Every structure is written in C-alpha cells, then in structure tokens.
Amino acid sequence: MAAKQKITRRPKLKPDSDVASPMPRSQRPDSRYRRIGFVLPVFLLLFVVGFAGIYSKWWGSFTVDDVSPGVYSIEVVREFPHDPQAFTQGLLYAENDTLYESTGLAGRSSVRKVALQSGKVEALQKMDRSYFGEGLTLLGERLFQVTWLQKTGFIYDRNNLSKFEEFTHEMKDGWGLATDGKMLFGTDGTSTLYQINPHNFRVMGKQVVRYRTHEVHNLNELEYINGEVWANIWQSDCIARISYKDGKVIGWILLQKLREGLITAGYNGIDVLNGIAWDNKEKRLFVTGKLWPKLYEIRLHPVKRRFDDGVIKRLCLRMPFDFGKP
C-alpha cells in the first residue's frame, strides 16, 4: 500500500475584484453551508488517511517470518550407549524402553531389538549379503523394512524378529519408512514423500517436499510424530518437520552440536546423523547416527532469532543425490 502523502497544493486565488473585495455580509452565501462544504471533505480525507495508516500498520505486522517454518535448537536430556558398529538406517521406539533398529552395509545389515538403557542388542536378524538394510517401522505386531537400491522389503515378527514375508513397493528406491498406525510413509532419497497402503504396498498419494520455493532432496529416515512426518536430510545435521498433506516444511531442527561433540571427544569414525525415535506415551524424542557410540534423548527449543534462507539452505538443503549410498 502506498505511503501517506502530505497534500501541499491548494487553489490559487484570482486577483479579480469579486474575490479580492469582501462582500457585504448580507450578500455572502450562508456561512453554515460553507463550513460544511469545507469540513466534510477534510473529515473524509482524514478518515481515509487514518484508516490507511491503521491498515498498513496491521498488515505490515504479518511478515514472511510469521508464516515461515520454525527453527529449533536442541537440549540433550540424557545420553545412552549405542553400538558403534551399527550403521543406523531405521530407528523406532516401542514400549518398555525397547528400541528396534535397522542397520545397513553389505554383509552387515540387520534388524535388531535393543534395550534403551544399556544399548544391549537383545535379538538380531541378519540379512542376506545381497541386501542393504534401510528404513524400519512398526505397525501392529509386524516390523516393515525397506532395502537400498531395490524395491524389495521385508516383514518381521516384532517378538522374535522371524521373517514373515517379502513385499515389493512402488518407490524408486527404499530409504525411509514410518507409519501413523494406518498407512506407511516412505522415502526413496528424492524430494518425494510417499503414502503407501500397508496391505498391498501401492502408493496412495505422494507429495514433493518443499521449504518455501526450494525442493528438499535426500529425504532419509522417517518418524511420524503428532500428525507430522519428521525426516533426516541425508548428509546434513538437520531434521525436517513435514506436513504430509501438502509437503510443506513446517519446521527445522538443528542438531549439528551432537556430531561436533562426538568428533571433539575423539570419535572420528562416525558417519552422518540418522535415526529418529519417538516415545508417544512419555513424549520423549531420541536421535542417533550411523556408527555413533551414543543415542540421545533431546528436547527442542524454538530459536527466537531470525534465520534467513541462506542459513537454512547452507545447513539443511542438499543437491539431489543420484541414487548412491544413502
């Protein structure tokens, strides 16, 4: 809206006798009508200008930042031991302080049941050497797992990790997997978030994930939390909070201090951040990474200072990955 402008022009008086010479009072137009004729336009002008100022002030208060994705830092609540040989690809929390984890690497891929407090592997199902384990989720009594560079997935019994069956999905590849208790969410390393029928594994819907105008590529491990899908962004220290209904990023979680802390402590063999688990009952959030010796319970804190596009792009956005090792 245009800014207020001060009115500086006024009509010039003509130097003729009718204007310059005062009229006898009895010959002048009624002064009441003259006052009304002057006051009414001024009143209307002031009203319009004043309303414009109020409207401009009100509208101006709603900037891009008010509808921008929130940015969150983290506080470490607790640290737990984690197998430093586990190339974490999928992670989830079950009841009674139990975690399920899918690990990758050729010849080392597995599905495992892990005690949260001790990090001890309580049960383990090794995968055939031809498969590279990827995302994992729990629906009912069954664990669903996808594999890298293939459209093959597996279903396991959650109690003893025995394999039920294989399935074939329609994604380009298998990276991440999560569920809301009804359908599956999947990623294939692109910017696409899939909604998958858990009975026939057909794609029910899909959304391209975007941060403002930018596609968010390399979507990796997933977790469903309070109506949102949270995704690790491969090769970054960021988690994207995604609205699965339209693909919009509604928040960023910045976790770079975890990896930096491990490196400072001498753990130089670690790989990238990967693995999100949510304890819905106790509202606890856990994260870890590939070959990390620790698993963390974290708490989120909104970052109040403004983050511009450049900072988020540098920290969280990556170039598309051409289906290499996730």
Model regions: which residues?
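Short, low-complexity, Lys/Arg-enriched N-terminal segments of secretory-pathway carbohydrate enzymes
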Residues: 1-32
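Blade-level signature of beta-propeller repeat domains, shared across WD40, Kelch, NHL, RCC1
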Residues: 272-326
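Beta-strand-rich domains and repeat architectures in extracellular enzymes and scaffolds
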Residues: 75-112, 124-137, 175-176, 289-294
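A short helix->beta-strand "capping" segment at the edge of beta-propeller domains
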Residues: 62-86, 115-123, 265
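Conserved beta-strand positions in repeat-built beta-propeller and related beta-rich domains
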Residues: 99-106, 143-151, 184-190, 231-235, ...
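Blade-loop segments of beta-propeller domains
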Residues: 117-156, 161-171
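Short loop/turn segments that connect beta-strands within beta-propeller blades
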Residues: 114-119, 157-161, 198-201, 243-247, ...
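Beta-rich, blade/repeat-based domains predominating
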Residues: 83-95, 129-142, 170-184, 213-228, ...
